[in-house]
Structures are given as structure tokens and as C-alpha cells.
Swiss-Prot record:
Name of the protein in question: Glucosamine-6-phosphate deaminase
A Pfam family assignment: Glucosamine_iso
Organism ancestry: Bacteria, Pseudomonadati, Pseudomonadota, Gammaproteobacteria, Enterobacterales
BP GO terms, sorted: carbohydrate metabolic process; glucosamine catabolic process; N-acetylglucosamine catabolic process; N-acetylneuraminate catabolic process
Top EC group: hydrolase
GO molecular function annotation: glucosamine-6-phosphate deaminase activity; identical protein binding
Gene Ontology annotations for the cellular component aspect, listed alphabetically: cytoplasm
Length: 270
């Protein structure tokens, strides 16, 4: 596992965006051989999406031959609802780049048969072989996508009941009214995520510090979903300084030294 400890949330957004662009460009995708990118929603990746849009407009990257799969979607709200993840993705990213509509994949939270919808999504991912890079965020309790604490570490795309903690955290998007937050969501599973060639998790803020400590210094534990990254051959956590506050000083120092060249190169370009 790699940890890229940066100064602030803005740096996390810029570094992760440039990393994605470097991966896409190195892959040199074509219509027959597209780059498969997994994407999250939430407040943490907004800075990444903003930088990706800027890099696209500057001619640094094209998404014409990129296929995206989003992590999750609420059950029971329409796609055009202002808090649906369909709406979020189009408003904050997809409508501002050159990705073809047919290359965009999001779960349908209003499907009449959610089990069939989840299997369709799994099958669609498998039809491309694997996701090359899956970017995600992490919840205060260590959840990735909507894989809440105690989720099976081999789980596949499915419907999940959202915890009170998650619904409370997300209520800020629903007029601070938890009763407006859906109780269920469709989500890729931990096993689905682990099938990706590479996983990059973004974490910003002191409220994510305990989850980052569990991911890096703790044991693999289904109560901390993020700890599954320890079992992945190519996982990376990109975080700001506040998110490292629960880590041992020597742990942070170790990763600063390990990634010194990369962090230094980034700082020189700011």
C-alpha cells in the first residue's frame, strides 16, 4: 500500500487528477481498448473533478476512449433529483468533458428488480475485463462506496441498508433532514472494488483520521472496510495532513520519505 501525504485538500485534488491523467495517457486508449475508470461521488472528489475538467480543457487529456463506472446510487430517488448521483456526476464532471454518453455507467436506483440490476452492472464491468483504476473516498467509519461496517470483504454489487451515521453525514445534502436521506442504496461490493487493477482512495479532513489509521496501521477487519486495501496488490491513499493525525509520527515520516521524490516533484509544479 502507498500513502501520499499532502498538505491540504486542494493538493489532494490536484495530485489525484494529475495521477489519473498520467494513467489514461500512458494507457493510450482506443475505441477497441478503452481505459476503464471507477468513480465516486461526495464532497472529497470535487477538487479532483474540477482539476480533471481544467486539464481536459487545456488539452492535457481526452475522455473519448474512457469508460466510467460509478460506485453507487441511492434507491428510490429519480435520476434528475438534485441529490441523485446521476445528477451529481453530470453536474460536477461528466457534462464538462468529451466522454461519449454510451461510455458512462451508473447504477439504476429505480430498477424494478434491484438484484437483476446489480448483476447487470457486475456483468458489464466484467465485459471489459477489469477496472483499470478505481478512485474512491472513505467515510468517517471507514466505509468505501456504501459498503458499511461489517460488510463482507468478498461482497459484490448489491443493495445495502445505510447506517444512521452515514445518513446523518449525508443529511447535509438534504437540508440537514435525515428523514429525506434514502435508507437504501445500490453499491459495488468490496470484492468488486478489489477486482480493480488499482485502487486510489482520497481522504481529507480530521474526521477521516481514524479511518486512515485503521487502513494503514490496523488489522484487516470487516468493521473497517477500508482495511481491505491492505490485501490489494496496488492500492494508494492520497490524503491531507489533518487526515494523518491518528497515525504514528514514525508512520507519517516513513511515507514522507518513501514518496519524497513524488511529493517534491508535485510541490515544485504548484
Amino acid at each position: 500500500m502507498r500513502l501520499i501525504p499532502l498538505a491540504n485538500a486542494s493538493d489532494v485534488g490536484k495530485w489525484s487528477a494529475h495521477y489519473i491523467v498520467s494513467k489514461i495517457n500512458a494507457f493510450n486508449p482506443t475505441a477497441e481498448h478503452p481505459f476503464i475508470l471507477g468513480l465516486p461521488t461526495g464532497s472529497t472528489p470535487l477538487a479532483t473533478y474540477k482539476e480533471l475538467i481544467a486539464l481536459h480543457k487545456a488539452g492535457k487529456v481526452s475522455f473519448k476512449y474512457v469508460v466510467t463506472f460509478n460506485m453507487d446510487e441511492y434507491v428510490g430517488i429519480t435520476e434528475n433529483h438534485p441529490q441523485s448521483y446521476h445528477h451529481f456526476m453530470h453536474q460536477n464532471f461528466l457534462d464538462h468533458i468529451d466522454i461519449p454518453k454510451e461510455n458512462i455507467n451508473l447504477l439504476n436506483g429505480n430498477a424494478s428488480d434491484v438484484e437483476t440490476e446489480c448483476q447487470r452492472y457486475e456483468d458489464k464491468i466484467k465485459s471489459y475485463g477489469q477496472i483499470h483504476l478505481f478512485m474512491g473516498g472513505v467515510g468517517n467509519d471507514g466505509h468505501i462506496a456504501f459498503n458499511e461496517p461489517a460488510s463482507s470483504l468478498t461482497s459484490r454489487t448489491r443493495i445495502k441498508t445505510l447506517t444512521v451515521e452515514t445518513r446523518t453525514a449525508n443529511s447535509r445534502f438534504f437540508d440537514n433532514d435525515i428523514n429525506q436521506v434514502p435508507k437504501y442504496a445500490l453499491t459495488v461490493g468490496v470484492g468488486t472494488l478489489m477486482d480493480a487493477e488499482e485502487i486510489m482512495i482520497l481522504a481529507t479532513g480530521l474526521n477521516k483520521a481514524q479511518a486512515i489509521q485503521a487502513a494503514i496501521e490496523g488489522n484487516v477487519n470487516h468493521m473497517w472496510t477500508i482495511s481491505c486495501l491492505q490485501m490489494h496488490p496496488k492500492s494508494i491513499i492520497v490524503c491531507d495532513e489533518p487526515a494523518t493525525m491518528e497515525l504514528k509520527v514514525k508512520t507519517v515520516k516513513y511515507f514522507h520519505q518513501l514518496e519524497a521524490d513524488i511529493i517534491g516533484e508535485f510541490a515544485s509544479k504548484k
